Regions:
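N-terminal subdomain of nucleotide-sugar transferases
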Residues: 1-51, 223-233
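A short, charged/proline- and glycine-enriched loop
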Residues: 2-15, 78-79, 194-203
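Extended catalytic core of nucleotide-activated donor transferases of GT-like folds
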Residues: 15-17, 31-150, 271-275
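Short, flexible/disordered intra-domain loops and linkers
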Residues: 17-27, 116-123, 248-251, 320-325
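Conserved catalytic-core segment of nucleotide-activated headgroup transferases in glycan assembly
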Residues: 23, 27-30, 148-151, 158-267
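Donor nucleotide-activated moiety binding/catalytic core segment of transferases
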Residues: 244-306
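Catalytic binding pocket for nucleotide-activated donors in carbohydrate/polymer assembly enzymes
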Residues: 282-362
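C-terminal alpha-helical cap of glycosyltransferases
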Residues: 359-382
């Protein structure tokens, strides 16, 4: 690795309110986890979050601002060696200012922007004019958006992209679950069926349902087929979050789900938005998930870290939970049935296995820290 010194690093965020929840989306969490990783570097980097909006920075921010200080762009623009543009975009004028003083500018791409952009175009979702910044020193792209968006980024920004490791940490999850029963961790619940000896399970589907990448329909079909096999003795209820608008206003969605047995028998509810930790703790035993082109997600780790059975098709973390390939619903059904019948036999061992598998993604992982220092060295000492 090229020799690298301690750096003054800024990571952008784009606050929309003074007390904005970190559960609104994953962007704020991403910035915090990346900041924690750089703070753990043996080189002793100085790291701060840089807000790119006009929202005031107050004590209402939902994280430890002493550990992860947040500053306005204008207050730190002369005090940075590197600015990583992650959760808020800087302007053309701000870019020129940083470049003139020698600050390195890195685009950290953690969203499927190609898909989001074409959906905005096709479905006329208003996002406003797009500023295509072509002055970056590096473009870093996390693995799950490489397939859909890497060439989109590189062509428009006129620079090759670099795939970088995904980073996560349980700190936000643990802060949210501190006062929950068992600190939000899974425990077998309910009374065992005297005929089968098994406890009936509460299923949950928690996809955002805002685009084609993470949608609830395939998980619904998995739950339906399992319900036809096991019935109400094994599946007490299915909650589908972020879906109340579909159940009320989408004729296509309504026409598909109204004839499902699990819906007809009153065993399914289509509800609004909930934060993950509380909903898992209060309403869930098993989570069913499906993604299409976004095969790593914080949600996957939050579910598995706390020991909940997780039925999913995310091939970039296939070692987690109960995996099925692609759109193979039959395998998904078999995995769900296995979890219903056997997950509680070794729920503690399962949780330990999940946490061991997630270690390679943690912000405190020494190998991961070293990889990011090498990435910084390539940018700062080309």
């Amino acid at each position: 690795m090229t020799k690298l010194r301690a750096l003054r690093i800024g990571i952008t965020i784009g606050l929309r309110s003074e007390s904005e929840s970190i559960w609104v989306n994953g962007i704020k969490q991403n910035a915090l986890y990346l900041a924690k990783l750089f703070q753990h570097s043996p080189l002793g980097h100085s790291v701060m979050l840089v807000n790119t909006t006009t929202v005031a920075l107050t004590d209402a921010l939902p994280w430890d601002t002493k550990r992860f200080p947040a500053r306005r762009f204008d207050d730190v623009k002369d005090a940075l060696d590197v600015l990583i543009e992650l959760g808020g975009q800087i302007s053309d004028e701000q870019t020129r200012y940083l470049k003139a003083r020698g600050t390195k500018l890195i685009s950290y791409c953690c969203g499927p922007e190609y898909v989001q952009m074409i959906e905005a175009m096709i479905f006329r979702r208003v996002s406003g004019p797009v500023f295509i910044n072509q002055q970056y020193d590096a473009i870093w792209v996390i693995p799950q958006v490489m397939e859909t968006s890497a060439h989109f980024f590189s062509t428009l920004r006129r620079l090759p992209v670099r795939e970088v490791p995904f980073v996560w940490d349980p700190m936000c999850l643990q802060a949210s679950t501190r006062r929950l029963p068992f600190e939000g961790e899974y425990r077998p619940g309910g009374y065992a069926n005297p005929r089968t000896g098994r406890r009936p399970k509460r299923l949950a589907v928690m996809e955002p349902n805002i685009d084609v990448l993470k949608f609830c329909l395939y998980p619904l079909l998995i739950a339906e087929q399992a319900f036809r096999i096991e019935g109400g003795d094994a599946i007490v209820h299915l909650h589908v979050t972020n879906a109340d608008h579909l159940a009320r206003h989408s004729p296509e969605f309504i026409s598909i789900v109204k004839d499902l047995d699990i819906v007809r028998m009153g065993k399914a509810s289509f509800v609004g938005r909930y934060d993950t930790p509380h909903f898992l703790s209060e309403h869930t035993d098993i989570v069913i998930s499906h993604q299409w082109g976004l095969a790593l997600n914080y949600f996957h780790f939050e579910v598995c870290w706390n020991g909940f059975a997780f039925i999913h098709n995310a091939h970039l973390c296939r070692e987690l939970g109960y995996f099925y390939e692609g759109n193979d619903i039959e395998t998904g059904v078999r995995q769900l049935l296995h979890a219903i019948r056997h997950h509680d036999n070794d729920w503690q061992g399962y949780r330990a296995k999940q946490r061991k598998a997630i270690l390679r993604f943690l912000a405190s992982n020494l190998g991961l820290i070293s990889q990011y220092d090498e990435l910084l060295a390539d940018v700062c000492n080309p």
